[in-house]
Amino acid sequence: MIDLTAEQQQLAKIVHEYASQFPPTENGDAQLLQGCYDYMEAFKRVMDSASKVQMDYICLQYPGYFRFAKWMERLAQGIADGVIEVPKDH
């Protein structure tokens, strides 16, 4: 087992449980995205504190965390590509 801190486990589980409550459908994805802001800080704290090996382990152990991560990646790519517009005051 990969050693995770108690905080990493707790935060990964919080994000996992949030993302897992929505069905893996287009509507479920929309619901996930509507409330994702409240979980971004926990998500980022895990990402910033985990090694690549730890992140791989977290994504295997917490599929909801992985789903959340994939959506954050898609959003970031959409913003970078100019497909998603971000208001200038953000």
Predicted regions and their residues:
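Residue-level detector of alpha-helix boundary/anchor positions
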Residues: M1-L4, F43
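Residue-level detector of alpha-helical transmembrane segments in integral membrane proteins
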Residues: I2, H16-E17, D56, A80
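Short terminal alpha-helical segments
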Residues: D3-N27
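Acidic, low-complexity, intrinsically disordered interaction modules
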Residues: P24-A80
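Short acidic DE-rich linear segments
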Residues: P87-H90
